[in-house]
Amino acid sequence: MTPPHEGPTAELEEELALAAKADEPERVEKRRIAKVIGVLALSAFVMILNETVLGVALPVIMDDFAIAASSAQWLTTGFLLTMAVVIPTTGFLIQRFTTRTLFVVAVGLFLVGTLVGALAPTFIVLLVARIVQAAGTAIIMPLLMTTTLTSVAPRYRGTVMGLNSVVISVAPAIGPTLSGIVIHSFGWRAVFGFMLPVIAILFLVGVVAIRTNHETRRPSFDVASMILSAFAFGGIVYGLASIESLITHGAWQPIVAFVVGIAALLVFIVRQVSL
């Protein structure tokens, strides 16, 4: 004799098993997205942290390479200028290439720049290393935000965007403190040395974890707008970053750069509206 309620119980268990099986792809996709966002966020944290770490090291670098303060300041100014020029192109890059490809390029550039910076025999080599780092940093920040907007479910999107904002705001704030400790104990090259294994691990994890399914497009690339944006943001950033030389030495270059930047920005805006 069949025990009471055995039939309905078996049917209920079968329905629950089917429901769990149906939900499995969704759970797998959520875990995949969490891994992608996690790797991108941690990479962005390290790369944005790098933006401010050398400020404390400038006096030591000046002594090591026997350069003036105005030359050493280019380690910061060059970084900002590169980001100002590269960031406007990321809209095109994100449409043209997959998330995985851009991650490999961005973190790969930063990894190479960090290695070269740690071994830099001259100031020029160190400056080039900083520019390479900046190019990677300029790509990873928009990539993190775009991936969040396109991949995360709407009900979680606000939370993830908030966490991304924490990454962007906290990293540059703690950079000088951490670099001060490292430089005092190990020297300025250790700033690059400590970042190198961390970013290398993130690079390897990202190559394995990031798998993208979205289709890429071949959007038209407006060369004129790119040139205008480079002059606009590059000129404005250089003008503001060099304001000290204007005040202390009466240099005219910052004023010219700033005016050219503003003019290029106005032309850029008019062109974008008319397209």
Predicted feature residues:
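Extracytoplasmic
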Residues: 35-90, 175
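Helix-boundary and loop/linker segments of multi-pass membrane transporters
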Residues: 25-33, 116-119, 218, 247
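Transmembrane alpha-helical core residues of multi-pass small-molecule transporters
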Residues: 43, 59, 79, 109, ...
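Residue-level hotspots within pore-lining transmembrane alpha-helices
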Residues: 46-50, 116, 120, 132, ...
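Helix-loop-helix hairpins in multi-pass membrane proteins, especially solute transporters
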Residues: 87-224
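Hydrophobic transmembrane alpha-helices of multi-pass secondary transporters
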Residues: 32-48, 79, 109, 113, ...
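Cytosolic juxtamembrane N-terminal segment immediately preceding the first transmembrane helix
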Residues: 1-49, 63
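Hydrophobic transmembrane-helix bundles of small-molecule transporters
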Residues: 184-275
